[in-house]
Amino acid sequence: MEKPRKKPYGPAFWCAFGRAAAQFAAVAALAALLLPGGRAALPEDPAALARTALLAGVVRPVLEEAFYRGLVQRLLERLAGPRWALAGQAVVFGLAHGTVPQKLYGFAMGLVLGDCAEKTGRVWPGAALHSINNWIVLAGCLAGRGV
């Protein structure tokens, strides 16, 4: 039996989105304090940097949320239930990231974004948070190289 979709803009939706935003901020703050961060190599050419920013800040978050939360989480939910789906997609999302600290951060963010998708019934709120995260990381990388 398919679970009914939640109302997209009702109070429950905005409460779930606000909760996810708070969790996102907490995970990001803890990661900044506890995980040693590597800086990504960014292109020097302004046009290439603009393409990288567009891909990292818009395209990848939308595609990743559609895949991990829209496809993987929903498939796992049908197979094993919502708790296993949340954990499973977070593991897969975390493993898809580079270094061990990135994998740990990816896992934690996968839990937050997956919970957001579960509570709101939509992937776009998570895509918005994911995009904000990637823009913050990109800004940190640029600041780290003195731009």
Predicted regions and their residues:
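Membrane-interface helix/loop boundary segments of multi-pass membrane proteins
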Residues: 66-88, 115-122
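Small-polar-interrupted transmembrane alpha-helices in polytopic inner-membrane proteins
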Residues: 82-97, 131
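Active-site His/Glu-centered metal-binding helix of metallohydrolases
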Residues: 62-67, 71-72, 99, 128, ...
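Short, amphipathic, aromatic/basic-enriched membrane-interface segments that mark the entry/exit
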Residues: 58-59, 70-80, 94-101
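Functionally important transmembrane alpha-helices
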Residues: 90, 102-147
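Hydrophobic alpha-helical transmembrane segments
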Residues: 14-21, 50-54, 83-88, 103-107, ...
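Juxtamembrane helix-loop-helix connectors linking adjacent transmembrane helices
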Residues: 2-60, 74-78, 147
